[in-house]
Swiss-Prot record:
GO terms for molecular function: DNA-binding transcription factor activity, RNA polymerase II-specific; RNA polymerase II cis-regulatory region sequence-specific DNA binding; zinc ion binding. May be involved in transcriptional regulation. The gene is ZNF189. There is a cross-link at residues 67, 88, 160, 434, 452 (Glycyl lysine isopeptide (Lys-Gly) (interchain with G-Cter in SUMO2)). One of its GO terms (biological process) is regulation of transcription by RNA polymerase II. It comes from the Eukaryota. It is found in: Nucleus. It holds the Pfam family zf-C2H2. Ubiquitous. It comes from Homo sapiens. A zinc finger (C2H2-type) spans 148-170, 176-198, 204-226, 232-254, 260-282, 288-310, 316-338, 344-366, 372-394, 400-422, 456-478, 484-506, 512-534, 540-562, 568-590, 599-621. Residues 14-89 form the KRAB domain. The keyword Lyase does not apply. This is Zinc finger protein 189. The keyword DNA-binding applies.
Length: 626
């Protein structure tokens, strides 16, 4: 009886090799026993699925007995270093109907080829018998052949199983579900990796540092930290990376691509992580919490930097002097001391600085900006450190303590000056890079810090100063320089403090408030004078008649009654006056057309439209004469 001819091969039927996974010798050695067991189970499951779905390329009349007939995968290491992995399924006892499926993973260790590609004369007798008696043996598909092509995106695949997996990207199919949380995945391997979240299993351990991972690919990437391997190189700049995704992100620098867009403000980012961090500015989310002080941060990097305050860690060390810093930015700024680099240039005066913060503070000299205001008294400052020092006046805080006698000071300069009592040091150095003269500061306080010594001399008039900044300001009297310009009216000033006071004319700002009556002033000196009304203090006394005044200007004007001095002279009629306001009122006579009779004071020359106003005015002269 003739043997029945094999049925024609149906279109779309699979061989077991279509869904088989092949390992190289190196990959197989890397797997632990549990992983090899998993591999065996998956291969058996795949074969069982093919048989149960009736898509296997075999006789339809044959009934598989998968459970009993699939033998264990045997792992035999041949003398030639070849892995032997078999799966056998005996269909029935009929020799013509018997079909043995064997997943042959025999790889030559040196050349990486399959068993059937080795010349027959090079095989052992056992290997020749195995190859010749195997009914279905197919070569591993050529890595260049990609016969399975995706109609959606055109991507090609060598294996049909990979092609099927890829199609789920387009269809969104996720047939593999987690029993714990119900989350579904497109691949069974993804489920296995995901389930380790629930079990806490981390089977992949680093041989270098002992760190464990739940996914093998994460371990491979991690080990590149130890080996220094960077297999992914940029074609544009030749920079290499340890991870492919890092290369993809890097290439956006060259292409300018920013695919991640913020839905709130429209700002785009090249990296998704940057978008996530940016979105926290809208949501206010701060998911990273410090376990020491409960402070929270929007970025993990900020938390890491903050935690060094508690640990005292200073990982960034200067190669020149050995000084260590908590942040890399601090180290970069410090290194400019050694290099002398000053990349930040002021466009107004050309002065350069090593830090951008120094430039910003300097530019406030030109703009007159004083953004730091004291909530207690309203005084404002151009630098935060100056405000901090000033606030100690209100709080009474004296953080600088003398180790010799225990006396405390609110400023470090006060402590330094005091310590010279103990050391008998008689010199008074001044660090101009740390502190600068503030016109609003008490001159008495500054003279206590820098007593007597005035080493800065003006070449024009010989006047000396204890601080170089004071000399620079003084020299503008001789040069006429007025570098501080009002942007509103164009008026210029020799000092930034003068500009600030002037700008309050435009803004109407009156930051100095009297606590007694609530009256406010644009200048601190006016507030001090006003407060004399409440205190009744009149420190300025006339030596001639004993009359006292709350202001020095009032005393000077009064003394002209005794001396007869009239320094204010009218250019029209040569008449002179003891007070400037009297001259101003007098000049109105020349400037305005007389439409009515005016009444002029014989004592000072001030004119009035009403006679009663003149009489009231003359009472001032008679009161002063008493």
């Amino acid at each position: 009886m003739a043997s029945p001819s094999p049925p024609p091969e149906s279109k779309g039927l699979l061989t077991f090799e279509d869904v088989a996974v092949f390992f190289t010798q190196e990959e197989w050695d890397y797997l632990d026993p549990a992983q090899r067991s998993l591999y065996k189970d998956v291969m058996m499951e795949n074969y069982g699925n093919l048989v149960s779905l009736d898509v296997l390329n075999r006789d339809k009349d044959e009934e598989p007995t998968v459970k009993q007939e699939i033998e264990e995968i045997e792992e035999e290491v041949e003398p030639q270093g070849v892995i032997v992995t078999r799966i056998k399924s005996e269909i029935d006892q009929d020799p013509m109907g018997r079909e043995t499926f064997e997943l042959v993973g025999r790889l030559d260790k040196q050349r990486g080829i399959f068993l059937w590609e080795i010349p027959r004369e090079s095989l052992t007798q056992e290997q020749r018998m195995f190859r010749e008696n195997t009914n279905i043996i197919r070569k591993r598909p050529n890595s260049e052949e990609k016969c399975h092509k995706c109609e959606e995106c055109g991507k090609g695949f060598v294996r049909k199983a990979h092609f099927i997996q890829h199609q789920r990207v387009h269809t969104g199919e996720k047939p593999f579900q987690c029993n714990e949380c119900g989350k579904s995945f497109s691949r069974s391997s993804f489920v296995i990796e995901h389930q380790r979240i629930h079990t806490g299993e981390r089977p992949y351990e680093c041989n270098y540092c002992g760190k464990t991972f739940s996914v093998s690919s994460t371990l491979i990437r991690h080990q590149r930290i130890h080996t220094g391997e960077r297999p992914y190189q940029c074609n544009q700049c030749k920079q290499s990376f340890s991870q492919r995704r890092s290369l993809v992100k890097h290439q956006r620098i060259h292409t300018g691509e920013k695919p991640h867009k913020c839905s709130d403000c429209g700002k785009a980012f090249s990296w998704k992580s940057h978008l996530i961090e940016h979105q926290r500015t809208h949501t206010g989310e701060k998911p990273y919490h410090c376990t020491k002080c409960k402070k929270s941060f929007s970025r993990n990097s900020l938390l890491v930097e903050h935690q060094r305050i508690h640990t005292g860690e200073r990982p960034h060390k200067c190669g020149e002097c050995g000084k260590a810093f908590r942040l890399s930015t601090y180290l970069i700024q410090h290194q400019k001391i050694h290099t002398g680099e000053k990349p930040f240039l002021c466009i107004e005066c050309g002065k350069s600085f090593s830090r951008s913060s120094f430039l910003i503070e300097h530019q406030r000299i030109h703009t007159g900006e004083r953004p730091y205001q004291c909530k207690e008294c309203g005084k404002s400052f151009s630098q935060l450190c100056n405000l901090t020092r000033h606030q100690r006046i209100h709080t009474g805080d004296k953080p600088h303590k003398c180790e010799e006698c225990g006396k405390a000071f609110s400023r470090s300069s006060g402590l330094i000056q005091h310590q010279r009592i103990h050391t008998r040091e008689k010199t008074y150095p001044y660090n101009e890079t740390k502190e600068s003269f503030d016109p609003n500061c008490s001159l008495v306080i500054q003279q206590e810090v820098y007593p007597k010594e005035k080493s800065y001399k003006c070449d024009e008039c010989g006047k000396t100063f204890s601080v170089s900044a004071h000399l620079v300001q003084h020299q503008r009297i001789h040069t006429g320089e007025k570098p501080y310009l009002c942007t509103v009216c164009g008026k210029s000033f020799s000092r930034s403090s003068f500009l600030i006071e002037h700008q309050r004319i435009h803004t109407g700002e009156r930051p100095y408030l009297c606590r007694q009556c609530g009256k406010s002033f644009s200048q601190l000196c006016n507030l001090i004078r006003h407060q004399g009304v409440h205190t009744g203090n009149k420190p300025h006394k006339c030596d001639e008649c004993g009359k006292a005044f709350s202001r020095n200007s009032g005393l000077i004007q009064h003394q002209r009654i005794h001396t007869g001095e009239k320094p204010y002279k009218c250019e029209k009629c040569d008449k002179s006056f003891s007070q400037q306001r009297s001259l101003v009122n007098h000049q109105k006579i020349h400037a305005e057309v007389k439409t009515q009779e005016t009444h002029e004071c014989d004592a000072c020359g001030e004119a009035f439209n009403c006679r009663i106003s003149l009489i009231q005015h003359q009472k001032l002269h008679t009161a002063w004469m008493q």
